[in-house]
Amino acid sequence: MNILERAALTALHRMDPEKAHSLSLSALRSGLVPLPGPVTSPRLATVVGGLVLPNPVGLAAGYDKNAVALAALMRAGFGFLEVGAATPRPQPGNPQPRLFRLTEDRAAINRFGFNNDGAATICARLAMRPRGAVPVGLNLGANKDSPDRAADFAAVLAACGPHADFATVNVSSPNTERLRDLQGRQALTALLEGVMQVQAGFARPVPVFLKIAPDLSDADLAEIAEVALASGIAGIVATNTTLARDGLRSAHARETGGLSGAPLFERSTRVLARLSELTEGRLPLIGVGGVASAEEAYAKIRAGASAVQLYTAMVYQGIGLAARIARGLDALLLRDGFGSVAEAVGTGRADWLT
């Protein structure tokens, strides 16, 4: 991390977390943030669920909810971006305060509740983004007051799919009441059928991923793996934030909401490895949760991920983190004799299944 980035982070950490978040996006949009540009190599370039990625380090949904800083983020060293979640209608989300830094734990808790500008506005921004080598996907959400949340996911995909490189069905946010109920076999099967019917009508392929919670039993994971394999989706994103609070030291540890960051790493990686075992490598997995270094990204890949995503770690290490992780990952692959990311996927899975 350079001196400028460190100074900016110090200033941001003196602000309310949500205001700091908004200011960081404004700084990116205005061109005030030095950006490293694309990061790739023959080892890092990979294909995940039909997406051609310059590197496997992605931006998780939730940072740029409304797709306002895409041009800058495409130059920030990420191999792919995910914006949203978008819901059919705009909604304000839950009352503030709803974002909390847990500095001692290198973590955050949020209870945003899918606050966003709505699908129509976000779709328009996706359509106007610069085209390049970095795929941009959309996280699909449901309105809090919707009488048919499953239909909401299909509606957002229908509206925005033509302007997105991929889409992620988010049934795992803990901040919309009963949303996680859609992870059950019957509900999930019906939901994915509706989404895939919409996808089938597009003129070009738009891979669909499913984002799951980390707070699932082995039986739950087995059901999800079975449904996912039968549905025709492109892959699974594992995982969203957790409701667990094990071992936290920060004053905000008991705030309601989803916990992200370093404390999530082991829990989410064990879920990832279990899914890799259940799907027998037939379904690409994207590992999310606590990735803050090249070593942690590499661990996720060796546990079964074809790519990774990060967000909370940037709160503590800055926007340059993605490029640093990608370069470090390249060095780790070279060190261990892997010619590509794909060669390393799942090679350490057994370590996470004990």
Swiss-Prot record:
Subunit structure: Monomer.
PANTHER family named among the record's database cross-references: DIHYDROOROTATE DEHYDROGENASE (QUINONE), MITOCHONDRIAL (PTHR48109:SF4), DIHYDROOROTATE DEHYDROGENASE (QUINONE), MITOCHONDRIAL-RELATED (PTHR48109)
EC class of the enzyme, as a word: oxidoreductase
Localisation per UniProt entry: Cell membrane
One family name in Pfam for this protein: DHO_dh
Catalytic activities: (S)-dihydroorotate + a quinone = orotate + a quinol
Cofactor binding, per record: Binds 1 FMN per subunit.
Stated name of the protein: Dihydroorotate dehydrogenase (quinone)
GO CC entries: cytoplasm; plasma membrane
Family per record: Belongs to the dihydroorotate dehydrogenase family. Type 2 subfamily.
Function: Catalyzes the conversion of dihydroorotate to orotate with quinone as electron acceptor.
Requisite cofactors: FMN
GO molecular function: dihydroorotate dehydrogenase (quinone) activity
Matching InterPro entries: Aldolase_TIM (IPR013785), DHO_dehydrogenase (IPR050074), Dihydroorotate_DH_1_2 (IPR012135), Dihydroorotate_DH_2 (IPR005719), Dihydroorotate_DH_cat (IPR005720), Dihydroorotate_DH_CS (IPR001295)
Membrane topology: Peripheral membrane protein
